[in-house]
From Swiss-Prot:
GO terms for molecular function: small ribosomal subunit rRNA binding; structural constituent of ribosome. This is Small ribosomal subunit protein bS6. Belongs to the bacterial ribosomal protein bS6 family. The lineage of its organism: Bacteria, Pseudomonadati, Pseudomonadota, Gammaproteobacteria, Moraxellales. Binds together with bS18 to 16S ribosomal RNA. One of its GO terms (biological process) is translation. PANTHER family: MITOCHONDRIAL 28S RIBOSOMAL PROTEIN S6, SMALL RIBOSOMAL SUBUNIT PROTEIN BS6M. Residues 120-134 have a biased composition (Acidic residues). SUPFAM superfamilies: Ribosomal protein S6 (SSF54995).
Amino acid sequence: MRHYEVVLIVHPDQSDQVVGMVERYIKLVQDNNGMVHRLEDWGRRQLAYPINKIHKAHYVLFNIECDGATLEELEELFRYNDAIIRSLVVRRDDAITEPSQLAKSADEKRARKAPRSENFDNDQDDESNDDSDE
């Protein structure tokens, strides 16, 4: 079995159905003795260029290990699903399990924002404590 990295660009109106779509594709891979090594939902992002007059879309990345027949079936499902604007399948030498650069940067942003909000809450508590002393 070979390793593949799959990126899907889904129509923004279908963002609610992304979870169901991805679950269906993962089930297909697992039913055919494949494995899913990584799954990342990148969310709604700006496209580099408009596709069919659409400027934003929902991105999903997953790394799988499957045979050729399963991959062909997946690609056919991608092709005939109107919600999928574009799909990209790249063969990889090894399974990739660590988070992508995009996911790492998103985690770092969340980590930087968390202390700020905690400081803001502490500042408000300090102000309320100052008022109670008077």
